[in-house]
Amino acid sequence: MKKILLAILLLFILVACGNLETYHTPSAIKKGQKTVRLVDFPIDFEGRVTKDLEKKGWDVYAGNTGNQAIEVGLYNLKLDILGYGTGYLKFTDLRTGKEFARYKFRMADPDNVQKEIVKILESIPGA
């Protein structure tokens, strides 16, 4: 019985991981450019991400006001009955128009996705 549970747990861990693809490192941002636009986020998730980013000094916008430096888009989001999600996040430097990272996730806990967003944005030079 223990071996079966261990095998199921191991399978879940292998399937639940996400992968990060980075394309290039964006140029350093200045203090006034520490702005991010969130695109296509569910309202409750958007609120939690906004709160975490604001704690780190980011100005967060849900709409296009034209003065953001970074865009984080949430695409192909599908949630299961337990609230775990599948989809991907696309990180774009709006100063150059280039995508600099993509985070694909399967069967991910929203808290882990939220932490990954903060981690990726904080890795930008100057952030």
Positions of the model-derived regions?
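A broad structural signal for short, well-ordered beta-strand segments within beta-sheet-rich domains
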Residues: 32-35, 84
